[in-house]
Amino acid sequence: MNTPTATLNAPAADAESAAASAADKKAAFELNKLSKRLHRQVGQAITDFNMIQEGDRVMVCLSGGKDSYGMLDILLGLQQRAPITFSIVAVNLDQKQPGFPEHILPAYLKARGVEFHIENQDTYSIVKRVIPEGKTMCSLCSRLRRGILYRVADELGATKIALGHHRDDFLGTVFLNMFFGSKLKGMPPKLVSDDGRHTVIRPLAYVAETDLERWAEHRAFPIIPCTLCGTQDNLQRVQIKHMLRDWDQRFPGRIDNMHRAFSQVVPSHLMDRALFPFETLVPTGVADPAGDRAFDEDDSELCAPSGSADAAGDEVSVPVALIRRV
């Protein structure tokens, strides 16, 4: 027999249950969108840059971080539905860092049924011996890893080496090179290695780091933190990462626009004489519909204050039409 209290509490319980059900449906919907977006972006990058071809053996470099786990997971999904046939072998370089949990990756890869190879090389001792305390280890560590991975690729018969750099890594590299190297240089989605023998691909070129974080949480990857360099909070790359995250939060769309700019480069509007023949440029006296203009049609829109926090408060926009009449 229902008591009066139970009868009164029933509507509240039903409301809570309905709210929980709605929240679960929304979460499932968002995860489905995330999955589709990740697979679409990786598939698009592979297509745009012809990263993987029929019969390729792709060596997926797996560090144990969210990015490489995500890359492997997405590539395995695409492998099942791709119109071409390619194989995957996951490779981890065990650098003998103290406390590195050697059992995690083999257990995960066996459970997924993925072919894998663990390469044991004590690069940790070399880096610690050569690099002074407090100095950045990334450069030497990267060179050592690269040489080892190239050798392993040969031994395994891999035709492609896949690295887990994402969209934010691309942007961060551009700013690092500008701020500290005086170069306008990013991170190519596909390249031939410096020894001329290997093709390196970055299938996550279009993927945002925040999406990889959400995917890693959803898939419950057994993340292995990098104790060698990941705790060096003063790294220039970490500072750049914080800058980009701040921009993304304060100015939605800015990061996407900057990333798209990499595929819309106009060499004639830069200053590299190796890319454009400024020295030999002379007027021909003949109008060219495809020719260059000093001012683009939408320059006025780019310069005009928009009223947003991103606009320059004291700048005044001058219509392009007026400038052309001067």
From Swiss-Prot:
Report the EC code(s) recorded for this entry.
Answer: 2.8.1.-
At the top of the EC hierarchy, this enzyme's class is: transferase
Record bears the keyword Cytoplasm: yes
Reaction(s) catalysed (UniProt annotation):
cytidine(32) in tRNA + S-sulfanyl-L-cysteinyl-[cysteine desulfurase] + AH2 + ATP = 2-thiocytidine(32) in tRNA + L-cysteinyl-[cysteine desulfurase] + A + AMP + diphosphate + H(+)
Identify the InterPro entries for this entry: Rossmann-like_a/b/a_fold (IPR014729), TilS/TtcA_N (IPR011063), tRNA_Cyd_32_2_STrfase (IPR012089)
Write out the GO MF terms: 4 iron, 4 sulfur cluster binding; ATP binding; magnesium ion binding; sulfurtransferase activity; tRNA binding
User: Can you list the disulfide-bonded cysteine pairs?
Assistant: none
Per UniProt, [4Fe-4S] cluster binds at C138, C141, C229
Q: Chief location of this protein?
A: cytoplasm
Q: Any other noteworthy remark?
A: The thiolation reaction likely consists of two steps: a first activation step by ATP to form an adenylated intermediate of the target base of tRNA, and a second nucleophilic substitution step of the sulfur (S) atom supplied by the hydrosulfide attached to the Fe-S cluster.
Whom does it interact with, and what assembly results? Homodimer.
Any idea what this protein is called? tRNA-cytidine(32) 2-sulfurtransferase
Q: What organism is the protein native to?
A: Leptothrix cholodnii (strain ATCC 51168 / LMG 8142 / SP-6) (Leptothrix discophora (strain SP-6))
